[in-house]
Amino acid sequence: MSLPIIVKWGGQEYSVTTLSEDDTVLDLKQFLKTLTGVLPERQKLLGLKVKGKPAENDVKLGALKLKPNTKIMMMGTREESLEDVLCPPPDNDDVINDFDIEDEVVEVENREENLLKISRRVKEYKVEVLNPPREGKKLLVLDVDYTLFDHRSCAETGVELMRPYLHEFLTSAYEDYDIVIWSATNMKWIEAKMKELGVSTNANYKITFMLDSAAMITVHTPRRGLIDVKPLGVIWGKFSEFYSKKNTIMFDDIGRNFLMNPQNGLKIRPFMKAHLNRDKDKELVKLTQYLKEIAKLDDFLELNHKYWERYLSKKQGQ
């Protein structure tokens, strides 16, 4: 009996349709080698488990109880030099095609149809609270791809693609902020990434909850047509006793995600080509300091996060 599987690697999805339940994990890896060029011994398939443990190569696919078209994430690097291993984003990548949102904010932010969409998300979207909100803490909402993690380059482990100083950044932020992860993918991938990066299991900080693409809304802009955005109003509506415009900041490498709440968004520099930039990227070090400075404030609405570096430099010079 054929067992179709979808494997995600290097920002692309690969369909595997020629294997059956009698084939083994090694057979799957051998087939993936023909698709990706990654040797079986360099492949790590996330989510393939037997009795809670990673499946060995000789385990039959039928024993994994996979549903047809199950999606699996693969980590692994080809045998080329690091420069060759890097997978540059395509020309239409969101980072490259991001646009200046300021002209369209007023038209979109308060439009009734968009506010109604947020109200529906507040009522219908189910949030799994991992750790309860803490009284008196501010809120930090973080994107994943290109913000915390280079999701297009290829590596043997997610840790190699992790933005430098991530755990130090989150440890410091947790002192003053509840931390929420919001990615424009589905929850399965978010959970897999957070586990691979060691974020969901770190003893020095806790994630309050995570949101996926289903919590986003689509808005119409005069110049760009329909786009998906991350409205913080969904969080404020569900947790109004803890969070509001006054105490929330969101980091994302795509500015248009802030379209419904521009005052609360900080556009972070994207972390790309991890193998080349891992030793040079200090963005989270500086943002750790910025978060610590503004945590002293009662109202974030007096800030313009577009000039966060100028604000930090001024405060540190005093």
From Swiss-Prot:
It catalyses: O-phospho-L-seryl-[protein] + H2O = L-seryl-[protein] + phosphate; O-phospho-L-threonyl-[protein] + H2O = L-threonyl-[protein] + phosphate. GO terms for cellular component: nucleolus; nucleoplasm; nucleus. GO terms for molecular function: metal ion binding; proteasome regulatory particle binding; protein serine/threonine phosphatase activity. Residues 133-294 form the FCP1 homology domain. One of its GO terms (biological process) is regulation of proteasome assembly. It is found in: Nucleus. It holds the Pfam family ubiquitin. Keywords: Acetylation, Hydrolase, Magnesium, Metal-binding, Nucleus, Protein phosphatase. Mg(2+) binds at D143, D145, D253. Coiled coil: none annotated. Its cofactor is Mg(2+). Residues 3-81 form the Ubiquitin-like domain. Its EC number is 3.1.3.16. The modification N6-acetyllysine is found at K117. Its main location: nucleus. PROSITE patterns: FCP1, UBIQUITIN_2. Dephosphorylates 26S nuclear proteasomes, thereby decreasing their proteolytic activity. Recruited to the 19S regulatory particle of the 26S proteasome through its interaction with 19S component PSMD2/RPN1. Once recruited, dephosphorylates 19S component PSMC2/RPT1 which impairs PSMC2 ATPase activity and disrupts 26S proteasome assembly. Has also been reported to stimulate the proteolytic activity of the 26S proteasome. The Ubiquitin-like domain mediates interaction with proteasomes. PANTHER family: UBIQUITIN-LIKE DOMAIN-CONTAINING CTD PHOSPHATASE 1. This is Ubiquitin-like domain-containing CTD phosphatase 1. It comes from Rattus norvegicus (Rat). The gene is Ublcp1.
